[in-house]
């Protein structure tokens, strides 16, 4: 038996998220159908986590087990021949049988991209969120520092989030401006449902002068969603960039 690890890139616009669900097409479902067609049998595919409807990925990690003696390149190319144009396998490699893409993940890097422009951009509308008006970028950067470290992120999760614990560790959070584009790069141990999108909404309110760095600090002191954290920004600006592992997959 072999454990095959895939690095997957996808445009999440047309999908109801990553995970298979009864009502709506998902990325995992499409990949499992392609796997079944290639291998001639139904094969479960386990991902490193979930992305919500409309969210994209450059570095989703998933694994499947097979006894097929195919070269690694054949797995990648075979799947890409069967997948639609908005999903692609970027890499395929063999990892130890005990490796699990979710449970062995050490950290994840998400990026949220905002277009700071009064004019809409038809070519980028599916991968950025356009925001009119000016932002105080320096104030937003100061607020980013408050998120770094281990905190209770109860105030930064969706109301239907079912996570057993709301404590997470943020390793780094940076704002990078490239012309009209503003990227929020967040690297953390894990994320609650809608957490990055709510953090982004909170930072925007800091940039608009509606919240202060002190307000952010108070929200991180074990608050809940009713404590007026920021809005949940739209999904299209969010992208899973990379999942990090230690020795089991390096």
Curated annotation (Swiss-Prot):
Q: InterPro entries this protein is in?
A: PsdUridine_synth_cat_dom_sf (IPR020103), PsdUridine_synth_TruA (IPR001406), PsdUridine_synth_TruA_a/b_dom (IPR020097), PsdUridine_synth_TruA_C (IPR020095), TruA/RsuA/RluB/E/F_N (IPR020094)
Q: tRNA processing as a keyword? A: yes
Matching entries from SUPFAM superfamilies are given as: Pseudouridine synthase (SSF55120)
Which CDD domains does this UniProt record tie to the protein?
PseudoU_synth_EcTruA
Give the matching Gene3D superfamilies. Pseudouridine synthase I, catalytic domain, C-terminal subdomain (3.30.70.660), Pseudouridine synthase I, catalytic domain, N-terminal subdomain (3.30.70.580)
tRNA processing as a keyword?
Answer: yes
Q: Which GO terms describe its molecular function?
A: RNA binding; tRNA pseudouridine(38-40) synthase activity
The UniProt entry's GO biological process terms, in alphabetical order, are:
tRNA pseudouridine synthesis
| Catalyzed chemical reaction(s) | uridine(38/39/40) in tRNA = pseudouridine(38/39/40) in tRNA
Assigned keywords, A-Z: Isomerase, tRNA processing
EC annotation from Swiss-Prot or TrEMBL? 5.4.99.12
Q: Where is the active site?
A: 52 (nucleophile)
Q: Which residues bind substrate?
A: 110
One Pfam family of this protein, by short name? PseudoU_synth_1
Family that this chain belongs to: Belongs to the tRNA pseudouridine synthase TruA family.
Protein task: Formation of pseudouridine at positions 38, 39 and 40 in the anticodon stem and loop of transfer RNAs.
* Quaternary assembly: Homodimer.
Name of protein: tRNA pseudouridine synthase A
* Native source species: Citrifermentans bemidjiense (strain ATCC BAA-1014 / DSM 16622 / JCM 12645 / Bem) (Geobacter bemidjiensis)
| Classification lineage | Bacteria, Pseudomonadati, Thermodesulfobacteriota, Desulfuromonadia, Geobacterales
Gene encoding the protein: truA
